[in-house]
Amino acid sequence: VLERIQQREVMDDASYGALRVGKMLSGRIDPQIVAFLAAVAGEIRVEGIRCGGFAMHYLDTSVFLDKITAPVAIFTGADDIVVKPDAAAALKAGLPQAHHALLAGVGHAPYCEDAASFNAAIEAFLDAVLAG
């Protein structure tokens, strides 16, 4: 988190956005999508990084997982370097009833990296929910 704060303090929006996107994508997506996500990431401010870092390090919501009664879907990108496999495994363990889809060839933004596969995974989840 400190490294991200230091980077954000010295980089302009476009440079910071490009850096962040370069670290979260599989590298096999349309340049226009990369530019869009870089623009979104470029809007991140230092306070947002601090709050997100605090939440990641100190906020443990796992004690609430067994209270969830609604259908749950967990979508993970096989090449995601942001959400580590052990974090995804812990979430799946805490929600054994959850539908899980591991999406091949994508990183942290599967909805952009391979929208067709992501949408198919959502449809499969919704079909399973509707089938009861």
Predicted regions and their residues:
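Charged helix-capping and loop-helix junction motifs
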Residues: 1-4
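Conserved alpha/beta-hydrolase catalytic His-Asp/Glu region
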Residues: 9-67
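Solvent-exposed polar/charged
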Residues: 66, 93-94
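Short beta-strand/loop motif that positions the catalytic acidic residue
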Residues: 68, 74-76, 80
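Active-site acidic short loop of glycosyltransferases
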Residues: 69-70, 97
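Conserved alpha/beta-hydrolase "acid-adjacent" motif
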Residues: 81-87
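Catalytic active-site module of serine/aspartate enzymes centered on a nucleophile-bearing elbow/loop
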Residues: 97-132
